[in-house]
Regions:
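Positively charged, low-complexity intrinsically disordered leader regions
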Residues: 2-129
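Active-site/ligand-binding loops adjacent to catalytic centers
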Residues: 64-66, 196-234, 242, 279-287, ...
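Active-site nucleophile and cofactor-binding loops and adjacent substrate-binding regions
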Residues: 103-114, 132-142, 232-235, 261-266, ...
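Short glycine/serine/threonine-rich phosphate/pyrophosphate-binding segments
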Residues: 114-118, 134-152, 166-169, 264-274, ...
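Alpha-helix C-terminal capping segments
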Residues: 119-129, 143-155, 176-177, 274-284, ...
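A short, small-residue-rich loop immediately preceding and capping a beta-strand
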Residues: 124-163, 256-269, 290, 385, ...
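Active-site-proximal loop->helix
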Residues: 141-204, 300-313, 421-429
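Claisen-condensing/thiolase-fold acyl-transfer catalytic domains that form or cleave C-C bonds
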Residues: 264-272, 364-429
Length: 452
């Protein structure tokens, strides 16, 4: 019988993260101080982030960053995660393509997010921090951060996007189980939240609003740092453990991917699975395709603009060079809450601009159709976010059937959907719908970009 699952021995788990910035021909533009418009140094970023994460954020010299022993010890509780050949999905699609998925749903709390939550909390603890704050959409990051904070003895406060909190009530319960304070965003507990609610009392919340509130709380709480679940360079760095493992596992399978796919919100799991493979395109001229699957209701990669913008709605973050829909963009109430973000990470934005990858926009109904197919063939109910990656993989597998090519397709299953069943209920009952943005809506939002 052909092998289906590929696992690494504990001694083969990577001991370094891969920093693609060091190998990029065109380095990412620096973050700017929003007041002075001057490039920021690590010391400036460390006002809200841990010092070590701030250094990693701006490091364009070192391609390999050692994983601290304490972090590696925590990783070994659940890593490596399986690389799985999706034979049943291939059969259902009647495709010559070979489809593999990296199963991050088996991680603690059910997603890839813990891969960065652990090192971020470790660095905070090492630097004497006692409190951490963060934002979360669907709750995967908030749950992971709450868990990691408890492991390292930190107090955690989480602002969860209000509409996602309503759609997925058990995620906030998970966070509270680990001792975190959880509040829906926009809230009335911060100045940023009050301003947003005053302007729009029915605002459903966005990752941009939640980030504003989490940063404000971090700035006003003694001995507190802000942690982020995506977008920033150091988060993608930590997530490269995914792709580095997958490289070794694909070698065990005797194949190399022609296409690598992940869903896209801010870029953490996309960068995690793709960057280790992308370095071979950059350094060796390989021709692997890298596809970021984003919801077509939040199309920053496919319809956004490459400009400096804030990472949050209130304008508390540094100005970041990114593909953006505008920091005050109010996304539709889609169920892939982790993808409802206006901008793309700095590294991914530069790589897209330079042609190393592409975006693919996926309608919500198509994503759930693919998620149901995957559930019924592979026996795993995927997170709504991951459904976008599956939908993109299905498109590519169908394309392989048309051309007769035996493409090797690898995608990241970033999380399971067992706490997202209300979304599946809505889809199965026929009540789910697609959302689209008009060109006028996008242009109106882009009209509010800061002048740099």
């Amino acid at each position: 019988m052909a092998q289906k699952r590929f696992l690494l021995n504990e001694q083969d788990i990577p001991t370094q993260w891969y920093n693609i910035q060091a190998d990029m021909p065109t380095k990412p533009l620096p973050p700017l101080n929003p007041a002075t418009r001057e490039p920021m140094k690590a010391e400036d970023l460390a006002e809200i982030f841990s010092m070590e994460c701030s250094r990693q954020e701006l490091d364009c010299e070192h391609a390999w960053i050692d994983i601290p022993e304490e972090v590696l010890d925590m990783y070994k509780y659940y890593r490596s995660t399986p690389l799985v050949r999706a034979y049943a999905l291939e059969k259902a699609l009647d495709t010559p393509a070979h489809i593999y998925f990296k199963n991050e749903s088996v991680n603690p709390l059910g997603s890839h997010k813990v891969n960065s939550a652990i090192p971020q909390c470790y660095y905070c603890k090492k630097e004497g921090v006692t409190n951490v704050t963060t934002e979360t959409g669907a709750g995967q990051w908030g749950a992971a951060l709450s868990y990691a904070a408890k492991v390292f003895g930190l107090e955690a406060a989480v602002y969860q996007v209000k509409i996602s909190m309503q759609q997925k009530p058990y995620r906030s319960l998970i966070m509270r189980t680990f001792g975190a304070m959880v509040e829906g965003s926009p809230s009335m507990s911060t100045r940023a939240g009050k301003d947003i609610v005053t302007r729009d009392p029915t605002h459903p919340g966005s990752l941009g609003t939640a980030i504003s509130e989490a940063i404000e709380l971090a700035r006003t709480t003694p001995n507190c740092k802000y942690t982020l679940g995506s977008v920033l360079n150091h988060v993608a760095l930590h997530q490269t453990i995914i792709g580095l493992e997958a490289e070794k596992q694909m070698e065990m399978a005797g194949e190399y991917p022609d296409k690598v796919i992940a869903c896209f919100g801010g870029g953490s799991n996309f960068g995690g699975i793709t960057f280790p493979f992308m370095r071979h395109n950059i350094l060796e001229g390989k021709q692997t395709e890298f596809i970021a699957a984003e919801p077509n209701s939040c199309p920053k990669l496919t319809r956004g603009k490459f400009e400096y913008d804030f990472g949050d709605e209130a304008g508390y973050t540094p100005l970041l060079p990114m593909y953006t829909l505008g920091h005050d963009f109010k996304p539709a109430n889609i169920h892939a809450g982790g993808l409802r973000y206006h901008g793309a990470g700095v590294i991914v934005s530069q790589l897209l601009k330079d042609g190393y990858m592409c975006g693919m926009d996926i309608p919500q109904l198509e994503s759930f159709e693919a998620g149901i197919l995957f559930s019924r063939t592979e026996g795993i109910i995927p997170a709504p976010e991951s459904c976008n990656a599956i939908a993109a993989a299905v498109r590519e597998a169908k394309k392989a059937k048309e051309t007769g090519k035996q493409d090797v397709i690898l995608f990241c299953l970033s999380g399971h959907g067992l706490i997202d069943m209300t979304a599946y209920d809505t889809y199965i009952n026929g009540d789910l719908r697609n959302y689209t943005l008009s060109d006028e809506d996008i242009e109106r939002n882009l009209g509010t970009l800061p002048q740099v």
